[in-house]
């Protein structure tokens, strides 16, 4: 019963998580709009090229949202080998000349309160738990409620990790051969945080 009841809430929670990730991306872009605009202008791509580049970045927006979620969850993400962003800070390296990446924080250590980003997946977990408990009878046992909440957290974390795995890739070889979130750690961190939020 727990699995069947958890599917609907997990789908909704996955959508909420993706939306939260996209909001984080938009906030980062707003804070770094000057640098993003500078890189965009430096490309000198012309009208058609600018449209194509914008379309490419919009298409990749769900990926960026997942990377932002991975940052909030703890594992962080990398754009290139040596260029990573985690709670501890941003590490610079050779970066692809893509405007949206200019919205990343400048290399350096982050303040300790950056770890408060974990409140985002915890809140998503709380939402997932609320939806999960609402999918079963009000008089169900506490055990049944906890079970469906945990299964919902598991399905949500698995769905997000699968989307990250499918959307991951490379922009070339060597330093650009791996980008995005570390899927395994992303899944484990999300599972723990969503589960905690779901049952609290």
PLM region spans:
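N-terminal membrane-targeting/anchoring modules of bacterial envelope and secretion proteins
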Residues: 1-42, 47-51
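Cytoplasmic membrane-interface segments at the C-terminal ends of transmembrane helices
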Residues: 1-9, 29-30, 123-150, 196-200
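Alpha-helical transmembrane spans of integral membrane proteins, capturing the lipid-embedded, hydrophobic core
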Residues: 6-22, 118-123, 149, 153-157, ...
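C-terminal TM-helix exit segments that contain a strictly Trp-centered aromatic cap at the helix terminus
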Residues: 20-31, 66, 70-73, 156-168
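Membrane-interfacial segments
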Residues: 27, 31-35, 132-140, 167-175
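Long, glycine/tryptophan/cysteine-rich extracytoplasmic
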Residues: 35, 43-117, 165-200
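Extended hydrophobic-aromatic, low-complexity segments
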Residues: 80-81, 112, 126-128, 160
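Long mid-to-C-terminal scaffolding/interaction modules that assemble large complexes
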Residues: 141-158, 163-181
């Amino acid at each position: 019963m727990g699995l069947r009841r958890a599917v609907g809430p997990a789908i909704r929670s996955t959508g909420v998580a993706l939306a939260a990730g996209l909001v984080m991306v938009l906030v980062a872009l707003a804070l770094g709009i000057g640098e993003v605009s500078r890189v965009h202008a430096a490309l000198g791509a012309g009208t058609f090229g600018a449209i194509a580049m914008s379309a490419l970045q919009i298409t990749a927006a769900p990926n960026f949202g997942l990377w932002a979620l991975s940052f909030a969850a703890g594992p962080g993400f990398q754009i290139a080998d040596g260029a990573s962003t985690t709670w501890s800070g941003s590490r610079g390296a050779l970066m692809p000349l893509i405007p949206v990446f200019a919205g990343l924080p400048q290399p350096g250590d982050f303040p300790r309160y950056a770890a408060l980003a974990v409140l985002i997946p915890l809140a998503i977990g709380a939402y997932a738990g609320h939806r999960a408990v609402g999918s079963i009878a009000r008089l169900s046992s506490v055990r049944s409620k906890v079970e469906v909440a945990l299964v919902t957290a598991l399905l949500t974390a698995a769905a997000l990790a699968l989307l990250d795995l499918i959307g991951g890739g490379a922009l070339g070889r060597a330093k650009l051969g791996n980008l995005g979130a570390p899927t395994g750690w992303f899944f484990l961190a999300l599972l723990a945080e969503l589960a905690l939020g779901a049952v609290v």
